[in-house]
């Protein structure tokens, strides 16, 4: 499980309302000490905790937005730009009293999030434009464009360890294939429990997750190496080149050779 860390020295002693919005991928949320749930695209986590110094992203990919409101400063002085939109200190404080909450964005909320995300990614907007877009998003979220949802399947630290160690075992060498029975036996649990833990962390069944990982590896090798299709098939976990070609075509819409030709051409043009 990939982990991203960064210094957060400014956030140690203050009182915050933290809004985390998942745009793509998955992000781990510690719902309570030792209990974890996972954000997926279009979900929001609201908490009274200060920003963390690191986050875990199952699958190694995550895109999202984190908005942090300093409630101590807002209690001393609430800007008119916020109160004009109905964001009083009392309204914000009410959200912190609910603890760690998961919510699902409505279509309007998703549109506001996508707008701010696009502005941040493109990097052409002024700080004032970004502030306005962030304020608009906060107003939508607190104004009703995020609906509280059940947190779904939560897992313990030990259950998370089983899922992440199994993922590492399966992805370290894609040429090796493991059955659910082999994996569950290795960790001393039932097959149904293993599947539950893995899906809770990675958001999809083992078979789908590994198929996507194999195709990612194949695409990388096709675009960056001169290895033969047969060699790439083996490196991706397929003993038979024909089965590999069929699986690759189902995934990408083109044959391995066509994918290599198209991506080599794109690389040369760049």
Model segments located where?
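Aromatic (often tryptophan-rich) hydrophobic motifs at membrane interfaces
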Residues: 189, 193-194, 208-211
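A short beta-loop-beta micro-motif enriched in histidine and acidic residues
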Residues: 4-18, 60-62
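Aromatic- and Gly/Pro-rich donor/ligand-binding loops
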Residues: 2-4, 23
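Conserved hydrophobic/aromatic pocket- or pore-lining residues that grip, position, or stack substrates
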Residues: 130, 170, 194
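Short hydrophobic/aromatic patch on the recognition helix
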Residues: 193-194, 198, 243-244, 248
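Terminal helix-turn-helix DNA-binding modules in bacterial transcription factors
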Residues: 164-182, 199-241, 261-270
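Short, conserved beta-strand element in jelly-roll/cupin
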Residues: 12-28, 67-69
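Alpha-helical bundle regulatory/interaction domains
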Residues: 28-158, 163, 180, 185-191, ...
